Amino acid sequence: MQKLFLYPLNTFFAVLLGLLFTFFNFSYFYKIPSYNDIFRIFIIMLAYLFISIFFLKRKKINIIPNERLKNIYKPLLVISSLGFVIELVLYGIPLLAQGGRDEYKSIPVLHVLFYSILICSIIFSSIYGSAKSIIISFAIALVISVLFFTRQMLMVSFMIFMISMFIRYSQYKKIYIYILFFIFFLTVLFSFLGDIRQQSAGDYVDNYVYMIGGANENGTMLGTALYWVWLYIASPIYNLYLNFNVNNEMADACITYNKVGDCFSPYISNVVMPNTISKYIGAEQIDIESVVQNLNVGTGYAKAARLFGLAGVISQITLQFLFYVIGYILTPSRVRVVYTIYFSALSFFMIFDNLFVKGEFFFVFIIIMIIGKFFSSPIKENFEKKM
């Protein structure tokens, strides 16, 4: 059962879930997928299944209690919390700002660092910490998510928690009940944050999600909370279908990005390179095609599909696998479980977005490696003996 929660099988089932959601007719905006659409998604799923069968025949993961790593969440939580408090003092609260998060300014680079450190705190508390430490770190994450409208942080945090809990307590049957409860809680909270974000932007109306999602009679029967979930899982897959079709229909898919029609440069800067770095060097950020303008999320594969079609997506999956292998080798053995769980959490969200290239999520890998190196060094050993 562990394999179902870990990369790459968790991504396989996430993509399968997205595919299945697009078969439900809940919106006037979207059509049932064509055979070509289904075939392309099927190939993506086969790629992850191939990696699982032939390359990652992982054994059962056991989380060994570690007193050194158990309390590392505390300094991480303090640093990130202080950083966010400073931002709130300097720039105000996005929740109360006119225009919401879209017009909010933050401390360059440091905001990304605070974000990454907070996620690290959640990772280590979920894997090694007590119930108290988990509650504290999640309470802080929840507050930050609401104040800054960072639903991605909240979703990734819950996924990290669920994977960690399942691995830590998989021998107990009650863990399945707890996981279902947290999924339900996340569903309700997700829809709540979606509503208050639109309210802060000043464009909220009753049953807002029905309006932006083009809900038909079947869709309204779901209720707003479940319709939010269906819309945010299905609409990226629909947009992925569209980007595949646009690439297939255009004679030169990249002529809109540069005069020579070069696809390679935008592929590197948008699909492979962390966006914090690509923005710093001035690389062009491309936009994907979307069926509905305001629902412009297209999974983590849409940009690759827009540039190179199915070949671009398969290349992306291959590069992602190589990244996992190289990162696993470079990560100190003491924290490889942490690395695996975090990578698995991000890979699950490929049905929403490519979080691997988002700076705030990418730099978490570096922090994990630094912590692993620090706790494996002679300096740390001597320091702990003196303590």
What are these regions (language model features)?
Residues M1-L82:
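A structural signal for hydrophobic alpha-helical transmembrane segments in multi-pass membrane proteins
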Residues T11, V15, F42-L46, S80, ...:
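Alpha-helical transmembrane spans of integral membrane proteins, capturing the lipid-embedded, hydrophobic core
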Residues I32-Y35, I53-R168, I183-A201, I286-D287, ...:
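Membrane-embedded catalytic interface detector for glycan/lipid assembly enzymes
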Residues F55-R58, S121-G129, I237-N248, F321-I326:
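Transmembrane alpha-helical segments in integral membrane proteins
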Residues Y91, L95, L110, Q293-M387:
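Hydrophobic alpha-helical segments
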